[in-house]
Amino acid sequence: MEPLHPDQRRFLRRAGIAGRCGQGWHDRERPASGQGSGAAERGRLSRLGAAPARGGVSASLPVFPWDTLADAKALAGAHPDGIVDLSVGTPVDPVAPLIQEALAAASAAPGYPATAGTARLRESVVAALARRYGITRLTEAAVLPVIGTKELIAWLPTLLGLGGADLVVVPELAYPTYDVGARLAGTRVLRADALTQLGPQSPALLYLNSPSNPTGRVLGVDHLRKVVEWARGRGVLVVSDECYLGLGWDAEPVSVLHPSVCDGDHTGLLAVHSLSKSSSLAGYRAGFVVGDLEIVAELLAVRKHAGMMVPAPVQAAMVAALDDDAHERQQRERYAQRRAALLPALGSAGFAVDYSDAGLYLWATRGEPCRDSAAWLAQRGILVAPGDFYGPGGAQHVRVALTATDERVAAAVGRLTC
């Protein structure tokens, strides 16, 4: 293993974080098109009794995007055959019986669970990642269960001690919680997909997301290797959100921890995984982070103090889900069939679908403002997510989820093709 860059551990030393990024960086976040300014929207919602009347932490955050869909949801809900909700990527299929049984069997546990997770859970994570995704050289100490991956992403910059002197880089089109987590920690945020956009500066943390939410874009091995090499040369922590890794359709996603990317060296790398999509466990809040041993140990040390523990019955359910590949394959096939139905139906309605090579979404456009497309679909009883939820680059796209029942997907197809 090559010697570490002198700054490789800077993000672990709270006192050493201040001043680590150069001056002149500016947060490129802007209120998304169609959502209005955060202050104005919060004021409107306050008058409706739907938001805090006073400032505070929430005043530093953008409007919760789903709150802006109320009108479109009401319009879609008025359809005589009912709404087809393709907006939120929430599972609708039954949890596999073996997982339910594992949860129930562990439900008599009265004590506090271990923040680090049971040894059995950590063993299952290591084995499943090797078996399913070819991730090798992980040890149990490199695994940390989390209370759903959204929780981890929202608090990761804070848990790492980042602050106002630090820069967090997120994809130009991105899961909104990357930005929210940076704001909660008080860091600066830059949207960038290319390393050349960063110039000579060294951010504290750089997010990757492949397959992407919302676009379904898959980053290839060469791209990932380039990012890892660049980050290691500057002491930058790379966090790869891999919640959709097992859902490749037209491309085969690869983990940042795969030997072809990192040569088996997990230094400076974290991979975030969820069982919400692959095992329909969104309601269980079951996820985990794996990678760099020292960083995982630091996260564990802080999370112990904060009581960030995955309940023991959920840990038992996670073991059952990770040890069984059959239910995961069955769920993948369900999504594949829904994708095969929706993809041509969107085309017949005048939408072009960009990327969408993997994951749970179709990234669709008719070359018009995304809110207009969302309204057109809502008139037909179909609710989707406007692309501006995910950044300015999504202003002419909508995100169409595959997470509806077969019956509701068939209804959407009928409305799009009539």
From Swiss-Prot:
Keywords: Aminotransferase, Transferase. It comes from the Bacteria. Pfam families: Aminotran_1_2 (PF00155). CDD domains: AAT_like. This is Probable aminotransferase Rv1178. Residues 22-42 are annotated as: Disordered. It is an enzyme of class 2 (transferase). The keyword Nucleotidyltransferase does not apply.
